[in-house]
């Protein structure tokens, strides 16, 4: 038990290392040769039919275990959920539909530090649109953001005003989706942040904002710490705000500090649950990602691994496959899982955790002391709901804080209209 607490204490992830100097990162590590090719190349998706047939065959050939011995998800992803998902995936799901949606959008690749970066880039038809780079996390992808492209780039068609328009840049993280897979070490969130700054320069933007949750928050906050003059501010739906005394208490497994407000106690309990029961996936990917051959070889293995990310997302997905109408559809969920399968990125995406674990230990949710303007949207079913006073302490230039009544970890995907409205309000002052 002591060893487990020590592992958890070290885990409380690791990306805040940039407190000690993200701005100096480029000097050292750019022994990685910069390629002179800055070409931006159009990109289309086409998956060979043989790959889709192979996927279906593998699903139908799944070797199932016995049912869990409990009535809930305390032993992991439940057999009934996985069998319902597998049945729909093999018999009804059509990858070509999302492939067509992707190919209807302007997609590109460009090489940064030796890795081809895939991104969607949609310019608004409205003048003076504010450029925004949006970063996904794990187990997400650019699929998460497809529903917000319309409301952000064409707000008039979705109840907004022309002056609310954004240009959107939505990259796939290195090792994820249609981006290239790094063949050397060193692609952790600091390197990704620097690559995104390069990407926005390459696209010719002299001002922009950044948005992210999950790894996207880490990347966006690190971009803010690097403070390129073009970056006006950031928005996060999974903020890093946990005070030091809270992190210390959680890591040691002691009682919460006295005097917490109701919101603070709720956040403490949510974080406590996540750290004690929700970190299995991150521990394995952070320590031994190459061992995950099973999820690279079995679509059901991959799907169950991705579903076991956080309890509330799992509950939502279970309800969807039971036939309930929720923020996500069965197609949404399978689009994302199938993207990971077809691009063979189960292990390459996991390496982002390993890369981060190699860095000096600091907490993923620990404040990074971002000095530029920050906006925060709190969705109730996120891993933890950051209290306003924590956000105010973490972000000296907090320009916006709002608690919503619906939505979770995949906020843009689950609640695209509400998420888009948050972006319009949060970044209004930068117009």
Where are these regions (language model features)?
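Non-catalytic accessory segments flanking enzyme active sites
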Residues: 51-123, 332, 341-344, 348-363
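Glycine-rich "HGGG/HGxG" loop immediately N-terminal to the catalytic nucleophile
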Residues: 95-97, 160, 173-187, 221
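Short beta-strand element of the alpha/beta-hydrolase
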Residues: 129-137
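The serine-hydrolase catalytic nucleophile loop
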Residues: 138-150
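Conserved hydrolase catalytic core segment
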Residues: 151, 155-158, 205-256, 260
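Conserved alpha/beta-hydrolase
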Residues: 152-178
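Conserved acidic catalytic loop of the alpha/beta-hydrolase fold
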Residues: 190-208
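C-terminal subdomain of alpha/beta-hydrolase-fold enzymes, centered on the catalytic histidine
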Residues: 276, 283-431
């Amino acid at each position: 038990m002591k060893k487990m607490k020590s592992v958890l204490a070290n885990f409380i992830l690791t990306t805040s290392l940039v407190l000690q100097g993200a701005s100096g990162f480029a000097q050292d590590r750019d022994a990685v040769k910069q390629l002179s090719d800055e070409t931006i190349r159009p990109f289309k998706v086409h998956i060979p039919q043989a790959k889709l047939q192979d996927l279906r065959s593998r699903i139908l050939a799944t070797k199932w275990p016995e049912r869990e011995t409990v009535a809930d998800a305390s032993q992991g992803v439940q057999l009934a959920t996985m069998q319902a998902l597998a049945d729909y995936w093999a018999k009804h799901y059509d990858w070509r539909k999302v492939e067509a949606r992707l190919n209807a959008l302007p997609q590109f690749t460009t090489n940064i530090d030796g890795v081809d970066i895939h991104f969607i880039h949609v310019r608004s038809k409205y003048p003076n649109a504010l450029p925004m780079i949006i970063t996904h996390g794990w187990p997400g992808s650019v699929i998460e953001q497809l529903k917000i492209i319309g409301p952000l780039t064409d707000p008039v068609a979705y109840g907004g005003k022309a002056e609310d328009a954004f240009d959107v840049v939505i990259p796939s993280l290195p090792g994820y989706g249609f981006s290239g897979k790094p063949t050397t070490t060193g692609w952790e969130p600091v390197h990704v942040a620097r690559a995104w700054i390069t990407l926005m320069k390459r696209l010719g933007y002299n001002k922009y904002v950044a948005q992210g949750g999950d790894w996207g928050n880490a990347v966006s906050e690190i971009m803010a710490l690097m403070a390129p003059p073009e970056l006006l501010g950031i928005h996060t739906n999974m903020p890093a705000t946990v005070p030091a005394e809270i992190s210390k208490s959680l890591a040691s497994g002691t009682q919460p500090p006295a005097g917490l407000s109701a919101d603070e106690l709720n956040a403490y309990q949510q974080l406590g649950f996540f750290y004690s029961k929700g970190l299995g996936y991150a521990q394995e990917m952070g320590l031994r990602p190459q061992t995950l051959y099973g999820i690279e070889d079995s679509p059901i293995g991959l799907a169950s691994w991705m579903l076991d990310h956080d309890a509330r997302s799992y509950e939502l997905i279970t309800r969807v496959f039971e036939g309930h109408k929720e923020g996500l559809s069965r197609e949404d969920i399978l689009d994302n899982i199938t993207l990971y399968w077809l691009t063979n990125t189960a292990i390459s995406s996991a390496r982002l955790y390993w890369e981060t674990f190699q860095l000096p230990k600091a907490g993923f949710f620990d404040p990074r002391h971002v000095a530029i303007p920050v906006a925060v949207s709190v969705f109730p079913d996120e891993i933890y709901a950051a209290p306003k006073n924590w956000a105010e302490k973490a972000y000296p230039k907090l320009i916006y804080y709002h608690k919503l009544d619906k939505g979770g970890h995949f906020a843009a995907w689950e609640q695209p209209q509400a998420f888009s409205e948050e972006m319009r309000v949060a970044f209004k002052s930068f117009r």
